[in-house]
């Protein structure tokens, strides 16, 4: 190991403080029921680093040990079985059914492993193996230029072969497998364990593992590989302090097993963009209720954002990035590129500089979304939503609506029967006040089940609905007006007819009264003018 690499190892060992002691700030935006947690620095994967690993093997004739019940004979049988299994798995076994399964799997994984698979296929060739063998003849590590022009780091693990050749075989040749040197047997078990675990992992994963275990690559080997990467000392420092992340994001690909060598490719992430600002957006559902009709919306731009070359790398899922020592380790293969103006959606969803995305629904949901330093709680309907302190019990019952609960003095939140435990991350919490965006919408005209759409499209849909309702109201008013006019005409005609009939009736009654009065008057006049008659007997 060169002095520079020794320095890196010592730096990681003695640096017990976080590499990036940043202060996190969590802002709750009341208008959109969302939280932005900022203060992280980036560690973005921009490529892969390939290493060809070669474990040297030894040919051991175990025929003479088959009749022995010794511990050594048992261990030799396990060693032989592991080598046979690896040969079956390797792409050199042309007639193997497992080979088809292996190739189908690695070819179906896409661009993430294309380079590693291509390299694994290349070093299957005897000519390439010979190049590697010659390059590492006098050292266990060397950069090898392959015939296809690719340069790779080649590492050789020969401790197992050296032990078998120099210590174990001489003993077997003298006393067969009845070796009573228990120290030698235990040492063989220890060295053999790596080969057995590598065989087990490749066998269980059809020749390709999605992580790099400490058997595939020891910590010492990993440190040596990172120390030789063509990146800055600061980048090496961050990667060496995050070995677990390096392993979880790496791959191991079986290449070949020949007479004396097991060859496989280790593909490690290369984090090329460092120390730019990163933040994460998390949101929950916000609803507006009128007469048991709901309008609900949520931001659809959740995820991680990191500055990268004048724009933002956007990772749609909050799980796309892994946090360690204040750094967000993210894979650019999972990212989208968005303009820096997208951050304006935090304070103004109607910004004209970017199409802010939301999802809509007419069905409420009560739930909680954990944030870095608290929790967003959406509480609606008849659900019980409580804030709990471990020592004091329930300290608050939440009304309907969206609420931000800081982790200060709070241990957990319960929504219905579900309990959410808050993290104990320390930082600064800020509440940005504002009228909930959802309050401006009428549940009757609110669109149902739109996912990841621009808010201007939602506005357009709402305006269309409002236009339809307005047109319907106008038609209804017109119909009512016509009915009212018809009713008025009927009323007038009826009134006129009644008046005419009343006049006629009164005229008839007047005429009759006139006739009766005239007859009475005529009779009186006649009785006065006629003389009286005397009757004689």
Swiss-Prot record:
Biological process, per Gene Ontology: entry receptor-mediated virion attachment to host cell; fusion of virus membrane with host plasma membrane; symbiont entry into host cell
Extracellular side: 26-486
InterPro entries the UniProt entry points to: Fusion_F0_Paramyxovir (IPR000776)
S-S pairs: 33-402, 65-177, 278-306, 287-296, 321-330, 345-356, 379-385
Signal peptide (UniProt feature, chain positions): 1-21
SUPFAM superfamilies: Virus ectodomain (SSF58069)
A UniProt-annotated Pfam family: Fusion_gly
Site feature Cleavage, where: 101-102
TM annotation in the entry: 487-515
Ranges in a coiled coil: 120-174, 444-479
Gene Ontology cellular component list: host cell Golgi membrane; host cell plasma membrane; membrane; viral envelope; virion membrane
Glycosylation sites: 463
Keyword terms, alphabetized: Cleavage on pair of basic residues, Coiled coil, Disulfide bond, Fusion of virus membrane with host cell membrane, Fusion of virus membrane with host membrane, Glycoprotein, Host cell membrane, Host Golgi apparatus, Host membrane, Host-virus interaction, Membrane, Signal, Transmembrane, Transmembrane helix, Viral attachment to host cell, Viral attachment to host entry receptor, Viral envelope protein, Viral penetration into host cytoplasm, Virion, Virus entry into host cell
Cytoplasmic side: 516-537
UniProt region (Fusion peptide), positions on chain: 102-122
Similarity field: Belongs to the paramyxoviruses fusion glycoprotein family.
Name of this chain's protein: Fusion glycoprotein F0
